[in-house]
């Protein structure tokens, strides 16, 4: 669509694509404006555009946000991001939830143009009276649009001074360039030839879509010595400890009846015994499907009790939604058209090479897409009626993107607070598109990014333009993934990855047992756990671990506390990396308003590393020559840091510094590590 501008043009004039003042390449933009950019309530983000005009006259620009009712808010002035680039930007802040829009307005700035000429001509004595009269007329025009009496009086006083022939020309000009006049014109600039970009959509969602700490656990493992298989009632006893560690979301694997046909045994064996509990993702049996509770976990009333107890502790429930079936699911006989049938009439089981899932049937989506979408929405709404507002969707990349777009639009159309997390470890294009069509959060490649270069490159990508549509959830481990870094690095590796996940991403999580540093693989070279909880009950002695000091729960608790106390860690976009002289040491900072957090991590879980951290002081909101006290929030120590700083990080003792930058008024209570 063509840009629009406000002028005295007649209706016979044809609109142009560019507009009178060109406004080009407005960002953020998602799928050329077909999908909304994303933010959460209170989140700040940059809107930028290329703005210029013919000749040498000055231009200005501003951003206008319109709320879900279409009402424009106060516009935000933009600035040229780098001199001579014509790239303008401004930071705006999202308001209430809903669908907003934003536009960039560009305009000719006659006052700035006049000031530039006047500063040259008046000292040179060129066209003095004419130049001053031009200024007076511009200021009169500007004053006419100023609503406040005091501000208008300030500009009119400048007009009088410009026309006061009893004063020297330099004095008349100076009266029009005072800080007071500047302040009024900054609030109420004189704008000519205002040209607006096309509006772009902005979806503002609740904060949990961006920020939170997740804890995954299997309720069935929370039994008692007399009744090993846990229920929702026994699992609810674990909730206070989870809340005490500072988590916000409790994520449950599927809670539905588990099939018996081709049931997997321990460690993924193909021959299950009568005591094997099966894989929760093999959903469905004669006892019910996706809308039913596994009888061994209890009843729907027991689930409601679990949700209620979680809510009392400030915990939300995230429920796994795996759109697949065991061979025993009621759908297999009721809806045969929903499955792939081979020439011999059998149904093909699921595969994700090299993994095979003989106990699971995948869904075929093209024979009855309407029926599948209707049933999916019904199931989701069933669990929403029982207090679930977050769904972790299993392998959405193996289903049609259009299907998810339809389902999420239906749910969020009436319940915009419901959050969908895409568990899709797949190609970048698919992951990006799933985020763009509605998934509020995404799993990421974080597990496989372990070196300084890998982390820097990946987080630079995630915190850049991708942040306008894709929100990462950094799980440090999952029931499926035990990375070699954790297998071979021991407890220090678990500490390092927890610090990275909790401070790099506003949303992070762990799967139960991470705090105990469980790291025995199924076999060398495998990322599967030995005695994986996917296939068996796994009771843990939390009390003994705390008593013997074999848990890193205190570190996890401290990290979540730091996140809650520091707004900088609850956002993604303002992330900057700082140079260090060791590949094993990574440094980065985050800022939100006056809150700045600086993190330095030893990526080597086996060896002590010493390094010099060279801080980019302007990125911390400081001048290059300044030094400030920083408090390590992990230890309580305070250091005085400047541009170059020595650090010594010892695995098992000091895996990292997580520092808040203090203002000079804060007392220094520790030694100086400045070099």
Swiss-Prot record:
Q: Which positions does the site annotation Transition state stabilizer cover? A: 480
Documented EC number(s): 2.4.99.16
- Report the temperature dependence from the record: Optimum temperature is 30 degrees Celsius with maltohexaose as acceptor substrate.
- Record GO terms (molecular function): alpha-amylase activity; hexosyltransferase activity
Which GO BP terms apply?
Answer: alpha-glucan biosynthetic process; oligosaccharide catabolic process
Catalytic residue positions: 394, 423
Keyword terms, alphabetized: Carbohydrate metabolism, Glycosyltransferase, Transferase
Q: Which domain of life is it from?
A: Bacteria
SUPFAM superfamilies, A to Z: (Trans)glycosidases (SSF51445), Glycosyl hydrolase domain (SSF51011)
Report TM segments: none
Question: How does its activity get regulated?
Answer: Is competitively inhibited by alpha-, beta- and gamma-cyclodextrins (cyclic maltooligosaccharides), unlike GlgE from M.tuberculosis.
Q: How does activity depend on pH?
A: Optimum pH is 7.0 with maltohexaose as acceptor substrate.
SMART domains under this entry?
A: Aamy
According to its UniProt record, which reaction does this protein catalyse?
A: alpha-maltose 1-phosphate + [(1->4)-alpha-D-glucosyl](n) = [(1->4)-alpha-D-glucosyl](n+2) + phosphate
| Binding locations of alpha-maltose 1-phosphate | 264, 324, 359, 395, 534-535
Xref: InterPro entries: GlgE, GLGE_C, GlgE_dom_N/S, Glyco_hydro_13_cat_dom, Glyco_hydro_b, Glycoside_hydrolase_SF, Ig-like_fold
What family is this? Belongs to the glycosyl hydrolase 13 family. GlgE subfamily.
Subunit details: Homodimer.
Q: What does this protein do?
A: Maltosyltransferase that uses maltose 1-phosphate (M1P) as the sugar donor to elongate linear or branched alpha-(1->4)-glucans. Maltooligosaccharides with a degree of polymerization (DP) superior or equal to 4 are efficient acceptors, with DP6 being optimal in the GlgE-catalyzed polymerization with M1P. Is specific for the alpha-anomer of M1P as substrate, since the beta-anomer of M1P gives no activity. Alpha-D-glucose 1-phosphate cannot serve as a donor substrate, but alpha-maltosyl fluoride is an efficient donor in vitro.
User: What is the protein name for this chain?
Assistant: Alpha-1,4-glucan:maltose-1-phosphate maltosyltransferase 1
Q: Which organism is it from?
A: Streptomyces coelicolor (strain ATCC BAA-471 / A3(2) / M145)
Q: Which gene produces this protein?
A: glgE1
